[in-house]
Design a protein with these regions (language model features):
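Short beta-strand segments
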Residues: 2-4, 78, 128
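Conserved nucleotide-binding/hydrolysis micro-motifs of P-loop NTPases
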Residues: 5-9, 47-50, 80-83, 132, ...
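Short glycine-/polar-rich loops that comprise or flank the Walker A/P-loop
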Residues: 37-39, 69-71, 144-146
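Phosphate-binding beta-loop-alpha motif at adenosine-nucleotide cofactor sites
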Residues: 74-77, 150-154
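Active-site oxyanion/phosphate-handling segment shared across diverse enzymes
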Residues: 86, 93-97, 103-151
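Single conserved hydrophobic/aromatic residue that forms the stacking wall/gate
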Residues: 158-168
Length: 168
């Protein structure tokens, strides 16, 4: 779930503040519900710039649900596909400098393992709502073979069967 992009920091201050308040509300409110429904929650992106209270809620949510084995919810927070690729490149560069890997070991598989998503499966389906017809810097590496579903509706108005009909 693409919850907050790296580009969102460039919105007007009042919008960013409103988004932070929404995060505080939903991260805290949904914590027990997601755990009770056996949902495992993880995050991708760089959460360091977020306020301390939001980082605490994120940590609580991921820690509480870490052993859940039901649905998997990955929250993209302060995430951008290009920034993720840069982070992966830096991780590999550091491993090369520290002689943990050799240049011969750098390939698509080792690169993918250094992305924020690591060993997570790539998405089979990406749903884009509200009339947008672009990926908007989301999972650029991982979406290479994903099905794309575009809807003019907002996410809250999409019936769960719509993407299922598309892919079946």
């Amino acid at each position: 779930l693409y919850a907050f992009s790296t580009e969102n920091w460039y919105r007007p201050v009042y919008e960013v503040k409103a988004l932070m308040n929404l995060f505080k509300y939903y991260l805290n409110k949904k914590l027990i519900q997601l755990h009770a429904e056996n949902v495992k929650v993880s995050t991708i992106g760089d959460i360091e710039p977020f306020p301390k209270i939001i980082k605490k809620y994120i940590q609580n949510l991921t820690n509480l649900t870490t052993h859940n084995d039901g649905m998997y919810l990955n929250l993209a927070l302060n995430y951008g596909g290009r920034a993720e690729i840069v982070r992966a490149t830096k991780r590999i560069g550091l491993q090369l400098l520290q002689k943990k890997i050799s240049i011969e070991e750098v390939n698509e598989k080792s690169f993918a393992l250094n992305l924020d998503t690591g060993t997570d499966p790539y998405p089979d389906l990406i749903i884009r709502t509200a009339g947008e017809r672009r990926l908007s810097n989301f999972l650029l590496w991982q979406s290479a073979y994903s099905e794309l579903f575009f809807s003019d509706k907002t996410l809250s108005l999409i019936h769960i069967s719509e993407p299922t009909r598309l892919t079946s």
